């Protein structure tokens, strides 16, 4: 499992380069997804990997670890993620969000036993998740076409190009010991996937086309993220066409 996660960054960049070259371009009804044929192939590949390796591991993770332990793990990674969110809040000139996120980090690190407890939320310090893709969007960079990345899942061309910097800004990747980085990466994958077990099953059972459901949901969420929950009534995806809110 560790080996494919170590290769995920290069695979993601490869997908972005293929998109830039217009690989597998097809005419579709949705202007946001001009590479749907390629994206569906990658989506199916990700489904196979998930069903064979990631989902069973996440189910075992839930079975073995008590709920309070899993909550602590999620809080720990959330605290690490707040550091990069704080940086991007600053890059977006969001002064209050930057200060409050800094306060969250200090409160949870020192009063929450290294982030295992989310004391800051109890103190009503709002958690804001920001990344470099959102920062680019804040400064007017269009999302570009929808892209499904190998192993990493839904993205846009803008977010794919922002991915290397997001990875460099990930505090868990700053540990000098490679074994520690690998353990943290694997644990975070299990933490994220375990939290989606029921959601993914419901989507697959209820949707006639899970690919379309995931795509539309992801793009809507990213649009809301960029505009802090208040997106415009229409949105230009950089191809000359606008999509209604």
Residue ranges of each PLM-predicted region?
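N-terminal, post-signal-peptide region of Sec/Tat-exported proteins
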Residues: 51-79
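A structured, mid-to-C-terminal "fold-capping" secondary-structure block
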Residues: 25-27, 134, 139-245
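C-terminal motif of bacterial Sec signal peptides marking the signal peptidase cleavage site
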Residues: 19-22
